[in-house]
């Protein structure tokens, strides 16, 4: 599902944010003209589901008009708003439309303050309890620290009777951290993740990875058996908590200036103009050729060289951003020969 970045602005300043290249660095909003061009481009291949992202998309002064335009557009099959939830009360008539889904990234009151947290909870109360949006609202949490107190998300999930939660194992800031031992990075997160899963199991919630899924090889046989028995308890056709796949596909985020990036994790790697491509699938194919193909070829460690899952393109060992510098080197060499 392609996304449109409506604004670089955000009303929060989360230290772990993966979009720090853009967010709050400048006050750029997408223009009405560029928004319309982006939608026309995204729907050239037929009906599509559109994601609205930021920054915080609800900060855009034309957010209401954008929503109404998408709702009335027959080529837009659905809309997902990615939001921190602080301003949802301003747009209830648009948000509750059957076409709309909402993913609320829930931050701890220890980070954003009790007042902001209370506002988000009140907004969720209205949408879920008054407008019965339980099946069209997902909550998410960014697992950025092994010391994170996530009791607040457990309370919200129980408050609304939700049984799924989006999780993102955040990545380091690749621009400042240098080389990272990828497998060790995930191994260092294992104990925390297992406890998180066990606590979620205790309230009958099954998480799912947004991206940056740990390679399955970091888990011991005992840990894999527990994960598989955990997932098997729940009536879902599949769960990405288990299985040998540790990979992702290009999302395609369109920026306010009509440049596109593969995803925010690779946003500083390369940007292309949508005007140079016929449609979203063509941009995705370009990024697969430039980025993904090399990500599978590059081993995270010596053990990965003979890994069957890597060789059949089932595993990139988590976020492709871990390998961005190496991919740059590969592409530069290919261009030189």
Regions found by a protein language model. Give the residues of each.
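Activation segment
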Residues: 14, 61, 113, 262-264, ...
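Radical SAM/AdoMet-radical enzyme domain recognition
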Residues: 27, 32-53, 60-186
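Flexible mid-to-C-terminal extensions adjoining Fe-S/redox cofactors in radical SAM and related proteins
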Residues: 259-337
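Short, solvent-exposed loop/turn segments at secondary-structure junctions
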Residues: 11, 57, 86-87, 109, ...
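A C-terminal junction/extension of Radical SAM enzymes
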Residues: 174-269, 310
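Canonical Radical SAM [4Fe-4S] cluster-binding loop centered on the CxxxCxxC motif
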Residues: 1-33
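A structural signal for short, well-ordered beta-strand segments
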Residues: 2, 6, 139, 250-252, ...
């Amino acid at each position: 599902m392609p996304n449109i970045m409506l604004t670089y602005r955000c009303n929060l300043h989360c230290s772990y944010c993966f979009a720090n290249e853009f967010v709050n660095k400048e006050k750029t909003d997408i223009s009405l003209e560029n928004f319309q061009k982006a939608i026309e481009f995204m729907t050239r291949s037929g009906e599509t589901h559109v994601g609205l992202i930021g920054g915080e998309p609800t900060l855009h002064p034309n957010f209401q008009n954008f929503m109404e335009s998408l709702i009335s557009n027959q080529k837009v099959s659905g809309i997902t708003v990615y939001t921190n939830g602080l301003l949802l009360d301003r747009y209830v008539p648009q948000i509750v439309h059957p076409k709309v889904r909402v993913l609320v990234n829930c931050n701890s009151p220890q980070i954003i303050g009790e007042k902001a947290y209370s506002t988000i909870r009140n907004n969720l109360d209205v949408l879920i309890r008054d407008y019965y949006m339980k099946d069209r609202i997902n909550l998410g949490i960014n697992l950025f620290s092994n010391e994170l107190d996530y009791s607040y998300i457990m309370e919200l999930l129980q408050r609304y009777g939700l049984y799924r939660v989006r999780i993102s194992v955040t990545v380091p800031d690749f621009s400042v951290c240098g080389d990272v031992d990828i497998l060790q990075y995930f191994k260092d997160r294992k104990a925390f993740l297992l406890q998180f899963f066990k606590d979620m199991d205790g309230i009958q919630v099954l998480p799912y990875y947004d991206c940056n899924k740990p390679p399955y090889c970091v888990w011991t046989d005992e840990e894999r058996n527990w994960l598989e028995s955990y997932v098997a308890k729940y009536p879902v056709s599949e769960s990405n908590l288990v299985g040998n796949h540790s990979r992702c596909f290009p999302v395609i985020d369109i920026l306010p200036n009509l440049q596109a990036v593969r995803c925010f994790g690779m946003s500083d790697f390369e940007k292309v103009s949508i005007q140079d491509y016929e449609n979203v699938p063509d941009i995705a194919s370009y990024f697969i050729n430039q980025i993904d193909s090399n990500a599978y070829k590059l081993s995270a460690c010596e053990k990965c060289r003979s890994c069957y899952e890597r060789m059949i393109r089932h595993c990139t060992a988590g976020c492709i951003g871990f390998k961005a510098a190496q991919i740059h080197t590969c592409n530069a060499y290919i261009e030189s020969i």
